[in-house]
């Protein structure tokens, strides 16, 4: 549970206050959890036998197999990369690499092993909501100039909300994940109690997250959100004839409104909307041009080492080897930070090769497979709950086209994948797990 508070940790005494504390805290919590988990297996024979059977059943689940394959190839790519040491340990600034990926995998397997009931997952989501709210409160205090809080100030030109994450782009996708948890809680725990104090607290957090999202002003996440809404509503319309017409109209309204805002993004009316930057979606924007250069460099790097890539954390070597002078303009300085390709597609292709990229994609294909295979389960998720899963995955993948994964996205991605493994157990696997539990 404590891992979901990782997002709140800010260590102002370090050179990278928004990053270092998070990965140190996460690793400590996961390591301690693993130690106590193993001690429990060692000293409780009856419980350990059940856990072994449970794990055996889990490793027959297609999604668990896919996640395991991705992590395995990620580590293998580092071992055979241009700098295995750096691929595994990363650096002080990023704190990623193989060591962090191993911790995320342990986290993934621990929650799958220990969270056997719906109430366990709901409690985890409550912790995630708490972390999201605290992240936002930190940003408010920092924005107001409170002593001891670092980050963007409200008075800064072109202010964008950074929270306790330090980067508006990751604030945006983070609140989309926390909104998924909030909506799931409303659809389950508070389905018939929407006026209760718990439900009202969730509605309040959703409103807070909406404001944060708006002031984070991140175009990739905005496009991801719109795509998620359209696809999720489309799925509901496809599976529910009764609501099909109303949902089709809703999708049409969303598309028209967004289209108008994008078409007239240069008007004074639109520019007065907080976070109006998100409506400026053009390929002429400097941020897009910078990324286009980095994607070309990443593609060339992939062609040089197509199987397992250059190794995690080694994009900087590709950037140096194939440096494009158009990236640096004396009048404007350099663009996006150049140790990443700023795209989940090009980052995984360049750093883990075609094998790593296919393993990454296989996680979502496997999710789609168990999603489909479990559709006839009488005790399975409702169509609305299924639409939430579709929405958050679509939002994550779309925004990831122009952004790379970091700790605050990885922890949510692995949480959602673990929860999907639990929620969409296909009949044969579900029977084994329930018997073993």
Predicted regions: what is each one?
Residues 1-14, 27-40, 71-79, 97-110, ...:
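Alpha-helical transmembrane segments of multi-pass inner-membrane proteins
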Residues 16-17, 86-91, 214-219, 400-407:
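Membrane-interface helix caps and helix-loop-helix hairpins in membrane proteins
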Residues 17-47, 51-76:
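Hydrophobic alpha-helical transmembrane segments in multi-pass integral membrane proteins
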Residues 22-23, 88-98, 159-160:
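Non-cytosolic membrane-interface motifs at loop->transmembrane helix junctions
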Residues 52-54, 423-437:
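Arg/Gly-rich low-complexity intrinsically disordered repeat tracts
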Residues 85-92, 185-191, 323:
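Short juxtamembrane and helix-loop transition motifs at transmembrane-helix boundaries
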Residues 142, 147-162, 271-289, 296-297, ...:
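Interfacial juxtamembrane loops and adjacent helix segments
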């Amino acid at each position: 549970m404590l891992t979901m508070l990782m997002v709140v940790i800010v260590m102002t005494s370090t050179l990278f206050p928004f990053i270092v504390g998070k990965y140190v805290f996460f690793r400590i919590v996961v390591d301690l959890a693993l130690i106590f988990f193993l001690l429990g297996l060692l000293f409780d024979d009856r419980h350990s036998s059940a856990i072994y059977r449970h794990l055996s059943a889990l490793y027959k689940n297609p999604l668990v197999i896919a996640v395991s394959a991705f992590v395995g190839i990620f580590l293998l790519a580092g071992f055979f990369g241009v700098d295995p040491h750096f691929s595994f340990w990363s650096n002080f600034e990023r704190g990623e690499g193989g060591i962090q990926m191993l911790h995320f995998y342990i986290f993934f397997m621990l929650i799958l092993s220990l969270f056997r009931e719906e109430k366990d997952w709901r409690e985890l989501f409550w912790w995630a909501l708490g972390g999201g709210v605290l992240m936002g409160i930190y940003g408010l205090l920092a924005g107001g100039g409170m002593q001891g809080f670092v980050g963007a100030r409200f008075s800064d030109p072109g202010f964008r909300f950074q929270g306790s994450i330090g980067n508006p782009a990751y604030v945006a996708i983070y609140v989309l994940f926390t909104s998924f948890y909030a909506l799931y809680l409303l659809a389950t725990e508070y389905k018939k109690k929407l006026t209760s104090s718990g439900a009202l607290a969730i509605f309040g957090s959703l409103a807070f997250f909406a404001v944060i999202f708006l002031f984070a002003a991140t175009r990739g996440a905005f496009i991801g959100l719109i795509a998620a809404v359209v696809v999720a509503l489309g799925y509901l319309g496809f599976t529910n004839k009764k609501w099909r017409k109303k949902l089709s109209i809703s999708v049409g309204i969303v598309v028209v409104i967004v289209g108008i805002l994008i078409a007239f993004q240069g008007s004074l009316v639109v520019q007065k909307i907080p976070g109006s930057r998100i409506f400026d979606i053009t390929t002429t924007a400097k941020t897009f041009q910078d990324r286009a250069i980095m994607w070309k460099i990443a593609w060339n790097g992939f062609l040089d080492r197509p199987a397992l890539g250059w190794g995690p954390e080694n994009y900087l070597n590709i950037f140096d080897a194939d440096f494009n002078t158009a990236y640096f303009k004396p009048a404007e300085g350099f663009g996006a930070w150049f140790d990443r390709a700023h795209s989940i597609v090009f980052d995984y292709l360049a750093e883990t090769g075609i094998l790593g990229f296919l393993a990454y994609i296989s996680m979502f294909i496997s999710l789609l497979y168990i999603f489909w295979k479990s559709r006839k389960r009488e005790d399975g998720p409702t169509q609305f709950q299924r639409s939430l899963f579709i929405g958050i995955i679509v939002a994550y993948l779309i925004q990831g086209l122009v952004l790379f994964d970091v700790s605050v996205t990885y922890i949510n991605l692995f949480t959602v994948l673990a929860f999907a493994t639990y929620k969409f157990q296909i009949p044969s696997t579900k029977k084994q797990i329930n018997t073993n539990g």
